[in-house]
Amino acid sequence: MVGWLIYRLHLDPLSRIPGPLLAKFVPICNIRMVLTGRMMFTFKELHDTYGPVVRIGPSELSFATHSAFDTIYGPYGDKNFSLYGSRKGLLGSLDKENRRKLRPLVATSLNELLAAKGEEYCHLAMDEQLASHHVGQTEATPVSLSTLNNRYLWQFASMAANGNCGDETDRGTSFTNIFMGLSFMALTQVIAICFIFRQPVHPGEVNYDRDESPFPDNLHSRLQQAASRTSLHVPEYLLQINCFVLRFSIYGTADNMLNALFYFLLRNPQCLKRLEEEVSCVGATVNELSDDRLAKLPYLNACINETFRIAPAFNGGILQRVSCGATVDGVYVPPGVAVSVDHYTLGHDPQYWVKPDVFNPERWIDPDCKDNFKASRPFLIGARQCPGRQMAYQMFRVCVAKLVYLYTFELLNKDFDIERDTFSSYHWTGVKLDVTMKPRTPGVLGY
């Protein structure tokens, strides 16, 4: 025991990396962050205290520089950092051959689906949920905007991934296991497996019903067709997993990002007013709000980018990699040591951003802005860039523009604070918005 303590304190290759004392012996930072539900903010506190590289466990480092981001996730990252044994590896197959086969199929199929059905499915889902919530029919009736956003994004996700509308029972049960998986017991088991054995943990097969729905054009069917055209044998469970990931990416992450965007707009009425003015000039009716037009609106896209910066959906720890023996920011990381870059800390670092804690979409369109935009790259870069990036931007543009075009908003739960009242593990949840929604044009409800 004494020898082990001496090794951990003085002889371990990571012994000189700053961090909490207990992190030399146990993953105390992860335990603390999961127990408190403040992972996003705790990572930033650690980096504010110890600097740009922090030891957060016996064999885990967290970085907070854009140069570390380039090194770990950039074009050459795969040569020095592995998915094997990492948390990121838990999200999909780690088999290199399957990844090589599947990635171009997923990227191509998503882009084709986006072009063919993205806007249509988004409008259908929004119209149905606006109607079911009776939005705008009684101006004084409070509406849970966060619940409304959650439900139409769940429906859109189900249509895009598997061609069905989904139901409320499925919405609850499908993601209970994911959120439970981020609970203390499940997370510590995952950490123990990855830390002790450094072995990949393959997800079990997702149990999807065969597609018997009114939306036959969906990711699952397109992946099947693409695999058939290229004569590739892709196991069914891998097709299902990628559909599940799309579903979770839309419902499990985009809904909170959308709620965060509206939170900051409602808390900054000058930003909401400027966005209203920009969107109202797109067309004479809501039917003219095509994504081709919305993509050209600088302030709308700036609001989306600013939300990605100030309130990232995921903590960087979910993008963990395992070093094969590499140097990051002048620090040698021995083989087997896990590394990640914290997105929230990067997005709030004053060395990269002027007034980093202020919601300021103007920074993204100001030609004289001195901010370093490399410090906010929510979709990663290079070969590992998220294939759903275009779909995410389209979805946000359509949803935000349509609601802002049709309705005026008044925030009711003004005492809600996004930092104080939300829960953040590796995934940020719990943004609550109660509003009244008044039609801008009497009788024009959008459904």
UniProtKB/Swiss-Prot annotation:
<comment type="similarity">
    <text>Belongs to the cytochrome P450 family.</text>
</comment>
<comment type="pathway">
    <text>Secondary metabolite biosynthesis.</text>
</comment>
<dbReference type="InterPro" id="IPR036396">
    <property type="entry name" value="Cyt_P450_sf"/>
</dbReference>
<dbReference type="Pfam" id="PF00067">
    <property type="entry name" value="p450"/>
</dbReference>
<dbReference type="InterPro" id="IPR001128">
    <property type="entry name" value="Cyt_P450"/>
</dbReference>
<dbReference type="InterPro" id="IPR002401">
    <property type="entry name" value="Cyt_P450_E_grp-I"/>
</dbReference>
<keyword id="KW-0560">Oxidoreductase</keyword>
<keyword id="KW-0349">Heme</keyword>
<dbReference type="InterPro" id="IPR050121">
    <property type="entry name" value="Cytochrome_P450_monoxygenase"/>
</dbReference>
<dbReference type="GO" id="GO:0004497">
    <property type="term" value="F:monooxygenase activity"/>
</dbReference>
<feature type="binding site" description="axial binding residue">
    <location>
        <position position="386"/>
    </location>
    <ligand>
        <name>heme</name>
    </ligand>
</feature>
<keyword id="KW-0408">Iron</keyword>
<protein>
    <recommendedName>
        <fullName>Cytochrome P450 monooxygenase aunB</fullName>
        <ecNumber>1.-.-.-</ecNumber>
    </recommendedName>
</protein>
<keyword id="KW-0479">Metal-binding</keyword>
<keyword id="KW-0503">Monooxygenase</keyword>
<dbReference type="GO" id="GO:0020037">
    <property type="term" value="F:heme binding"/>
</dbReference>
<comment type="function">
    <text>Cytochrome P450 monooxygenase; part of the gene cluster that mediates the biosynthesis of aurasperone B, a dimeric gamma-naphthopyrone. The first step in the biosynthesis of aurasperone B is the production of gamma-naphthopyrone precursor YWA1 by the non-reducing polyketide synthase albA, via condensation of one acetyl-CoA starter unit with 6 malonyl-CoA units.</text>
</comment>
<dbReference type="GO" id="GO:0016705">
    <property type="term" value="F:oxidoreductase activity, acting on paired donors, with incorporation or reduction of molecular oxygen"/>
</dbReference>
<dbReference type="GO" id="GO:0005506">
    <property type="term" value="F:iron ion binding"/>
</dbReference>
